[in-house]
């Protein structure tokens, strides 16, 4: 994943493990609670980290999550390339917010968290351009909530990014490294 590569590329040593919480259930409960959608990534990052800390109580555990908000609606990952095309048509020529959060837990509590918001505008895309893009990316694009990967072929369809580039990749890296340097 891009988060894994990001953290490895800055020289961090760590192990990864899947969160033990049901992410979809956590998300559903959060949405039903009618809390501000923009706080969902911070909530999910914390829940993921806390679910892992149970098995690794003496380690620092880092959880992270990213969401996209477009026209005040949460955007979910596409399940197939047909859905990816619809999503790119919807986002074409328009701006959306990418919100990424990181939570650091130790023992049974969160000791630090951060959340960043970046704004991305996609180029105006026609069907042919979208089809060509999806043909190049293949199904791997389905792992990206916006159906583009800024660190790979995404610049072909991204018009502009306002805010932290690493946040667009799914991790508020500068804030995290600042936390680590103070710890």
Question: Which residues does each predicted region cover?
Answer:
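Acidic/polar active-site rim loop that often engages polyanionic ligands
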Residues: 25-27, 67-69, 109-116, 161
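N-terminal polybasic phosphate/anion-binding patch
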Residues: 1-60, 73-74, 128, 132, ...
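Short beta-strand-to-turn element immediately C-terminal to the catalytic PLP-Schiff-base lysine
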Residues: 69, 103-106, 123, 159-160
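Generic enzyme active-site microenvironment
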Residues: 63
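Short beta-strand scaffold segments in enzyme catalytic cores
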Residues: 66-68, 98-105, 148
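Anionic-ligand binding region
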Residues: 85-91, 100-118
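Active-site-adjacent loop/tail segments of enzyme domains
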Residues: 66-96, 122-124
């Amino acid at each position: 994943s891009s988060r894994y590569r990001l953290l490895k590329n800055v020289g961090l040593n760590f192990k990864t493990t899947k969160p033990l919480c049901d992410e979809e259930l956590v998300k559903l409960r959060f949405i039903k609670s009618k809390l501000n959608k923009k706080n969902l990534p911070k909530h999910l990052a914390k829940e993921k980290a806390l679910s892992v800390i149970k098995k690794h109580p003496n380690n620092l555990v880092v959880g992270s999550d990213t969401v996209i908000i477009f026209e005040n609606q949460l955007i979910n990952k596409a399940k197939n390339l047909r859905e990816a095309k619809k999503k790119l048509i919807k986002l074409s020529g328009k701006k959306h917010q990418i919100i990424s959060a990181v939570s650091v837990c130790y023992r049974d509590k969160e000791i630090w968290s951060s959340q960043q918001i970046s704004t991305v505008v996609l180029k105006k895309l026609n069907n042919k351009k979208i089809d060509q893009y999806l043909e190049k990316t293949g199904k791997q694009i389905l792992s990206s909530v916006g159906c583009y990967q800024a660190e790979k072929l995404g610049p072909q369809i991204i018009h502009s990014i306002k805010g932290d580039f690493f946040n667009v990749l799914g991790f508020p890296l500068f804030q995290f490294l600042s936390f680590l340097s103070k710890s």
